[in-house]
């Protein structure tokens, strides 16, 4: 699959220690037991030195939000800063969220289409932890989790895809139906509700019960390949039937992003999508990787950290414009 359509691959495993109650958010002593037990298991496996332990209560709000923007932690984890923590691998490829809805959410992310590698990284951590501890498991149901939809393998496999032309041609309704037929879900990554800012979507399995890990990965991969092919077909069509319009949209986006002095959140995502499309189609002397770096660094919390102060309103939009110009000028 082409990684210029697929931004990233993620696999996440939900695990719970057999002797601890499920909801630890209101149980600080047992939540601490979960953290220390996980650290100890990594130490026994010789993996502790590869990870940094970050307790949310010791972090600023903006630092927590920056981790969410980087997809290292979930928004749900941020709800319980007093008890939640995360172990982040030094290269940021693996994170172990502790004391969210489940005791552990083991997550691995890879650039482009690489679900198998992400899964292998998760299972490496899972094996290390399970050698020292017993996880909640039922012979018929599989791994037991806080939410029944996560029971079974406890695995969520997902791909992030940039689908601007499928969106503009109003095919996402049909895409949603196609995805649902094979037990997957599709949603916009940025924005609220049905909104998909930047035309970035996530596809993932809806249920984990009754299917093996390999079956889940294969299904998500197959749908990702299908969507990639559909988007690429529209790219080829655009180059033959709407080349001047496509080039105009791409060059306008490049002009705005390299010259704007104020860049609101919504406008940035629109321009980013056109810029990424141009990079994907070879219409700009920019790599897709550079464009995606701009996406990461233009997020609100990242901008505040870069500026060294809390920003809001027009000051935040001005900082976004400055940072984007800086990155695209490198």
Please give the residue ranges for each predicted region.
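Long, Pro/Ser/Thr-rich low-complexity/intrinsically disordered regulatory tracts in eukaryotic proteins
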Residues: 1-140, 155, 167-169, 174-176, ...
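Alpha-helical support elements that line or immediately flank enzyme active sites
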Residues: 159-165
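Conserved phosphate/anionic-ligand binding catalytic regions in large, soluble enzymes, centered on
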Residues: 142-159
